[in-house]
Structures are given as C-alpha cells and as structure tokens.
Design a protein with these regions (language model features):
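Oxyanion-binding and handling regions
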Residues: 1-24, 34-41, 94-225
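Conserved phosphate-binding/catalytic region of the ribokinase-like
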Residues: 26-28
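N-terminal phosphate-binding loop and adjacent alpha-helix
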Residues: 31-51
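N-terminal, well-ordered alpha-helical segments
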Residues: 40, 44-47, 61, 79, ...
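Phosphate/pyrophosphate-binding loops at sites that engage ATP/ADP/AMP, CoA/4′-phosphopantetheine
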Residues: 46-62, 133, 152-160
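DPxDG-like acidic metal-binding loop motif
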Residues: 62-93
Length: 225
C-alpha cells in the first residue's frame, strides 16, 4: 500500500510517503519536516514528499493521521486534509496515537528498557504512557492518561527514560523526541482496520470545561435580562 502520513501534533510537523511505491517487493520512505509553532504550509509539505517519491496524488491509497495528544490546531488540520482527500479520492484512513508513534520512534532510535512518553497537557498536567522496549519490539505497559508532574517524576525516578517533544522544559533528564510521519506511516502499514473520516477525532483525555449558557430570562415588560 502507498501511504501518505501526516503528523502535525508537535512543533515539528512532518509528512511522509511510505510503502511499495515502485510496486510489490519494493520499499519507499520519503519525509519532509517543518519546524516552528506557527508552521502552516501542509500542502507544500505534501507536494514535496509526493515529488520526492515520484508519486501522483491519485496514486495514494491510504492516509495515516497522528491523532495526538498535542497541538489541537495541528491535529485538526491534518484531520481536515484527510477528510477532504477521502471525499475526493476513496482512500483508506487510519488514525494513530502520537504517543504510540513516539514509542515506536524511541525503539527505532535504539532506546531499550522502560520508556515513558510525556506530552504537555497544560494546566500543570501531562499526558503519560509507559512502554517496555526490547531488542525486537515495544509494548505498552500502562496506557495513555493524564498525570500530575509528580507521577511523571516518579516514573523517571524508577528508571524510565522520559521522552517527548518538550519534555526538558519540565524534566531536565528527559530526551527530546518528536513524533515522525515516517514512523507513523510504518505503523499504519501494519493496520488492518480503517476508519471513516467523520470518526477521526483528536485524542483529548480531559473532559470539556465549557458550560452551556442558560436561556435568557424575560422580564415582565418583555425585555431580556
């Protein structure tokens, strides 16, 4: 399968093409990365990797989207692109946790043992997931959850390597690691289940704090309160 992967959940936004672009038994992996909190040229990145891979848009068979947690704006942008692509071309869609992508990236980079993925959740909290990495694979030990700084620090104190896009802002011993679209695409190639565009949603574990305003009260003279 020829997969276009979009990973926009961190300040290092990336797009990649992975798969058997040249036919069965071949392998292609191309990637383009843009850095900065205000990076906003996704279609240029997409065209860059398609050109590098010598692939036309109509040849893309699947889109893999990093669902976060992370930059809500970036993730929403990637989802919108995938939904539009699905409407224009009947491609397969896959949504993948960016925390899983980071675990796979850590394994690919040679880390072994216990690894904790740490992503800023704001409000003094973090998204935290724990993994075990050995020579052949990685596996989830504790699933993604919201955690206070004390729990993250405790994971590090137990010997976990803390990894994440901005982890050193809070934990100096951590290792900076960004989720990569190329890694996301390789994870997607192992997927056998696909999702409809309307069901793609950012991973956001915190309950909404927005309250619906009550209806206006009408005074005896007929004017609203």
């Amino acid at each position: 399968m020829k997969i276009l992967a979009l990973e926009f959940s961190s300040p290092h936004r990336s797009v990649a093409v992975v798969g058997n672009v040249r036919g069965p038994g071949t392998w292609t992996e191309t990637e383009a990365v843009e850095t900065g909190d205000r990076s906003n040229r996704p279609f240029e990145l997409i065209q860059d990797v398609l050109t590098q891979a010598r692939l036309e848009r109509v040849q893309v068979e699947g889109l893999a989207i990093g669902l976060g947690p992370g930059s809500y704006t970036g993730i929403r942008g990637a989802i919108a692109i995938a939904q539009g692509w699905k409407l224009a071309r009947d491609v397969r869609l896959m949504g993948i946790s960016s925390a899983e992508c980071l675990a796979a990236q850590a394994h690919s980079d040679g880390l072994r043992g216990r690894v904790s993925v740490v992503i800023d959740a704001q409000r003094g909290e973090f998204y935290l997931a724990n993994y075990e990495l050995d020579s052949s694979e990685w596996r989830e030990v504790q699933p993604l959850r919201l955690a206070p700084a004390e729990e993250v620090a405790a994971s590090g104190a137990k010997g976990d390597v803390l990894v994440g896009p901005e982890v050193q802002n809070w934990f100096q011993e951590g290792r900076i690691l960004f989720p990569r679209a190329a890694t996301l695409g390789k994870l997607a190639l192992k997927k056998t289940e696909f999702i409809e565009g309307q069901h793609l949603e950012p991973i956001y574990l915190r309950k909404s704090s927005f309250l619906k305003a009550p209806p206006p009260r009408i005074l005896p003279d007929g004017s609203p309160l």
